UniProtKB/Swiss-Prot annotation:
Signal peptide: none annotated. GO terms for molecular function: DNA-binding transcription factor activity, RNA polymerase II-specific; protein dimerization activity; RNA polymerase II cis-regulatory region sequence-specific DNA binding. It holds the Pfam family K-box. InterPro entries: MADS-box/MEF2_TF, MEF2-like_N, TF_Kbox, TF_MADSbox, TF_MADSbox_sf. The keyword Cell membrane does not apply. It comes from Vitis vinifera (Grape). It is found in: Nucleus. Expressed in tendrils and flowers. This is Agamous-like MADS-box protein AP1.
Amino acid sequence: MGRGRVQLKRIENKINRQVTFSKRRTGLLKKAHEISVLCDAEVALIVFSTKGKLFEYSTDSCMEKILDRYERYSYAERQLTATDPESQGNWSLEYSKLKAKIELLQRSQRHFLGEDLDSLSLKELQNLEQQLDTALKHIRSRKNQLMYESISELQRKEKAMQEQNNMLAKEIKEKEKTVAQQTHWEQQNHGLNTSSFLLPQQLPCLNMGGTYQGEAHGARRNELDLTLEPIYPSHLGCFTT
């Protein structure tokens, strides 16, 4: 006689219920992971215990992405099946869904900030660590890219300034050379004019000076002759007597 199907019902014993929940939860998360890997399916699993503790699993840790996809799909289905304006949405249900989504996002944010980690299992902590490592890699990559771009821009500006300085130095050197040549030419022209002005000229006074001295000597001699003429006979008279 075959074994009959066991009727499922709530376990009354609290300890047994907690043990069964722990075992079935582990198996459920494992099955969700297996179907995600084997069938390449996007799986999102959310479980709340009787104490309100959250347990979740999502393919590649993309719970928000899967929930967004679910919301879009559900909205499209409701739009297709709606027959009148009154059946287009239950605002109360929408509010509950949005509230649950906000709570999930806030909880994920606290986890990323290192808060409320006591409720996470080892697998969930490993997934969180992997997400943080991936985020850090992206942040470091972006930071290095910005630093490289900044260094490249500074090098480009430095090269442009160096080229400009070289051009200015060349212009200054050419101007100094021109000024030096002009100064040299002016000095040469000034030296030629000064030399021609200072050359001695032959003056007639030199010859005239010699004539003047000869004439003066002759005149003085004549005076002496005139002076000696009256004296000479007297001397002669003395000698005769």
